[in-house]
């Protein structure tokens, strides 16, 4: 991809897509942002926007044929993956590949690949297609267990279950949070882990693999709350994580940045999940690295050099959540939030708030992780999300 500008089409236009769009435009690309609703965050900065049902194969093919993009960059899971494969077969470049998008959109396919085909260490797991089957599948794993829809995003539909009496409720939660048409869950043993990390893994067109320093993160109900970089892990743990990340991304192929999640349990590293795109926990790289995860994604996608990846001594992020439902979103406390040095805010531009919805993120650097986390916490706490109706 030596000639510029390029036309980039984003399939999904949330806050991560918005940063991808900005990174693409800095490289002179023409960006078309697509989503199922108008005025999504990435649409606010894109050159053009399209509203469509992206699980509709005909609608997806129509919009791609209309714009003839050089690259298609999926930013969400809920896509017509058969249409993506058909488009790739005609010569359209799907990032990282149509197969990678299909495999990672459902937890069962990526888990079967990782644990079954590739032999990566994972939590023990089983699948269930109804509440009765869930009862049978959960008991052999021991209590507690974690129940998740095979297809969801941002932790939706997840719950930790401590006894058989709670499984029917867990099934209801999973079905309410599921995306797509699949009525299936994955049930996993609950790991008594020390830390969750994301290893941002960059795969270039020639097969070269690069890694960012590991990112530690904390979640609530499966949804990211804060992250920090670098995570303190041993050389052995880092080697295990890098080996597993390289193994699975080489199998998926293509070029781009992958967010590979692991649990650290004592000296062991356990594969958790993988996203073939920038990761929400990686928002910290907007303040921590010389090239953010979004810059790295675009460089890999477009075949551009990545001479080095350097990171600050310590950096952290903390999400800013809405507490109420409504439109006409406004923010107060921004001035107070930005009084400390080496801090920044991203306010995503979402037009609708609802309790627990991620509306922004606070970023901070420090000399140590605890200092950076405390600064990010103060920055985020100062910002209040208000709705006018």
Curated annotation (Swiss-Prot):
InterPro entries: ATP-grasp, ATP-grasp_carboxylate-amine, ATP_grasp_subdomain_1, PreATP-grasp_dom_sf, PurT, PurT/PurK_preATP-grasp, PurT_C, Rudment_hybrid_motif. GO terms for cellular component: cytosol. GO terms for biological process: 'de novo' IMP biosynthetic process. GO terms for molecular function: ATP binding; magnesium ion binding; phosphoribosylglycinamide formyltransferase 2 activity; phosphoribosylglycinamide formyltransferase activity. N(1)-(5-phospho-beta-D-ribosyl)glycinamide binds at residues 15-16, 75, 280, 350, 357-358. Its EC number is 6.3.1.21. Mg(2+) binds at residues 261, 273. This is Formate-dependent phosphoribosylglycinamide formyltransferase.
């Amino acid at each position: 991809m030596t000639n510029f500008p390029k036309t980039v089409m984003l399939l999904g236009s949330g806050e991560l897509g918005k940063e991808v769009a900005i990174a693409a435009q800095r490289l002179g690309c023409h960006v078309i942002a697509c989503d199922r609703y108008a005025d999504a965050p990435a649409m606010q900065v894109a050159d053009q926007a399209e509203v469509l049902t992206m699980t509709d194969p005909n609608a997806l093919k129509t919009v791609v044929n209309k714009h003839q993009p050089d690259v298609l960059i999926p930013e969400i899971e809920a896509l017509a993956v058969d249409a993506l494969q058909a488009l790739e077969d005609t010569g359209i470049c799907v990032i990282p590949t149509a197969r990678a998008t299909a495999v990672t959109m459902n937890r069962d396919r990526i888990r079967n690949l990782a644990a079954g085909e590739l032999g990566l260490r994972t939590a023990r797991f089983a699948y269930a297609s109804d509440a009765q089957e869930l009862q049978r599948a959960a008991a052999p794993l021991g209590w507690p267990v974690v129940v998740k829809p095979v297809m969801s995003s941002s932790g939706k539909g997840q719950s930790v279950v401590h006894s058989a009496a709670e499984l029917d409720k867990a099934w209801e939660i999973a079905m309410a949070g599921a995306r797509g048409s699949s009525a299936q869950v994955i049930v996993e043993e609950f790991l008594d882990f020390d830390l969750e990390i994301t290893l941002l893994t960059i795969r270039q067109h020639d097969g070269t693999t690069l890694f960012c320093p590991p990112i530690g993160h904390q979640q609530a109900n499966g949804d990211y709350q804060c992250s920090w970089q670098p995570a303190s892990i041993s050389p052995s743990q880092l080697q295990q994580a890098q080996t597993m990340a390289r193994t699975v991304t080489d199998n998926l192929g293509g070029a781009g940045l992958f967010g590979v999640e692991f649990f650290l349990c004592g000296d062991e590293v356990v594969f958790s999940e993988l996203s073939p795109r920038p990761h929400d926990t990686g928002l910290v790289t907007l303040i921590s690295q010389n090239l953010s995860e979004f810059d790295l994604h675009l460089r890999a996608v477009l075949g551009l050099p990545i001479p080095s990846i350097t990171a600050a001594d310590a950096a952290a992020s903390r999400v800013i959540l809405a507490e109420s439902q409504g439109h006409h979103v406004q923010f107060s406390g921004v001035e107070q939030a930005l009084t400390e040095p080496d801090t920044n805010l991203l306010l995503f531009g979402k037009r609708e708030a609802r309790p627990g919805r991620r509306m922004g993120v606070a970023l901070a650097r420090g000399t140590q992780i605890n200092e950076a986390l405390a600064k990010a916490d103060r920055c985020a706490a100062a910002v209040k999300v208000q709705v006018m109706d």
